[in-house]
């Protein structure tokens, strides 16, 4: 009873398995990361996100 809901990164289907039953792609945690005001890596995450937006 320790299974958690997972979401396929490719086709956005929810499953309890490690891989998607439709496409076989790996599934991950559908929840966003926890927010903490004392986020030690927030600066680096924002820089990375900014770089991704510039290349898109």
From Swiss-Prot:
Keyword Ribonucleoprotein: yes
Annotated Pfam families: Nop10p (PF04135)
GO molecular function, one term: snoRNA binding
UniProt-listed GO biological process terms: pseudouridine synthesis; rRNA processing
SUPFAM superfamilies in the cross-refs: Nop10-like SnoRNP (SSF144210)
Record has Transcription regulation as a keyword: no
CC annotations in GO: ribonucleoprotein complex
Entry keywords, A to Z: Ribonucleoprotein, Ribosome biogenesis, rRNA processing
Family: Belongs to the NOP10 family.
Role this protein plays: Involved in ribosome biogenesis; more specifically in 18S rRNA pseudouridylation and in cleavage of pre-rRNA.
Entry protein name: Ribosome biogenesis protein Nop10
């Amino acid at each position: 009873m320790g299974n958690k809901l997972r979401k396929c990164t490719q086709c956005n289907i929810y499953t309890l398995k490690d891989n998607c039953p439709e496409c076989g792609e790996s599934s991950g945690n559908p929840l966003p990361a926890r927010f903490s005001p004392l986020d030690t890596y927030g600066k680096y995450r924002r820089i990375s996100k900014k770089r991704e937006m510039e290349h898109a």
